Structure formats: C-alpha cells, structure tokens
Amino acid sequence: MASTALSSAFSLLSLPSSSSPAAAAAAAPRSFAVPSRARPRRAVAVVASTATESPKVLELGDAIAGLTLEEARGLVDHLQERLGVSAAAFAPAAVVAAPGAGGAGAAADEAPAEKTEFDVVIEEVPSSARIASIKVVRALTNLALKEAKDLIEGLPKKVKEGVSKDEAEDAKKQLEEVGAKVSIA
C-alpha cells in the first residue's frame, strides 16, 4: 500500500530533467493509484520495555506470576506488614464495594459499624409554619426561594443528605423550633 504510493512518487521524480515539458507530460503516468483501505488494519501488540530491565526483575516477575491465589494473598499480607502500608489506602472504593468479601471469619471479628452519615427528612409542616420553615430550609441548604417552597410543599422530603450527626440534629432542632415535624434517617 505504502510502497505503491512511494513507487509512484519516485517515478514522477525520476523523469529526465533535459526533456521538454511536453515529453514529461507524455511520460507521466495517466492514473495515480491511491491505496484503498479495503483491508482491515491489524492490531500490533507493543511490548513495553524499560531500559532498566534486569534478569533479577524478570525472574521475580516470573516467580510472582507463578504463585497461586493463596500464595499471592500471603505475599500481599507479608509486604503490607513489612512495608507498613495498607491496600485500603490505595483502593478505598474497592473496600467499600465489597464489605462481605472477607468471609465468615472476618465478619465475626468486625464490630458493627456505627452510622456516620444521616439524612434530615421533613415529614410535615403546618400551614401556619410554612413561611418560617421555608426561611429555615433556605438557610440550611442555600436553595432559592422557589426550590425551598417546592421542597416544603411536596412532603415528606429530605432536606439534607449524608451529613454528620451533629449537623443533622442541629437542622432538626431549627426546623422543629418553627413548627415542622422532622425525622433523622
């Protein structure tokens, strides 16, 4: 494909310079072959090589690749202990995504986790307390007037999500002071 284009280019360049323009036009090929892309491109595997690839590194890599899963887990545990690092520090999403992956033994060792994130839900607002409740909701959430009004009208709704216990209790206290019925979930 590329050779066809190159040979055409070289044949055009190799025309005799002493000939007249009419002779050059007569000697020039009448058609120019454009390589087609009818054949699919082939993927080429590129092997990454580093300048510091040593036989020791290759031997260690082959030894690690030959480990069973149980041996690999033991190696990881040993390296974590020896180097003082934790896999959870590098992959916090993986730890959260698979909380029961430790097996029955790990579940028995764990203490029940205390809830750290709470939602503040407005259950009911009396009609006499709507305006005051809208003001408090706007102060707590930085919502515009229309959004705060819509939130108060379609109850029950979450006012704050994923907040600390202190912040949830403070929001509940402020809303109850103006007459709203609030729960923390």
Swiss-Prot record:
Localization: Plastid, Chloroplast
One GO cellular component, as annotated: ribosome
GO biological process entries: translation
Top-level taxon of origin: Eukaryota
Annotated transit peptide: 1-47
GO-annotated molecular function: mRNA binding; structural constituent of ribosome
Pfam families (UniProt xref): Ribosomal_L12, Ribosomal_L12_N
Protein name as annotated: Large ribosomal subunit protein bL12c
Native source organism of the sequence: Oryza sativa subsp. japonica (Rice)
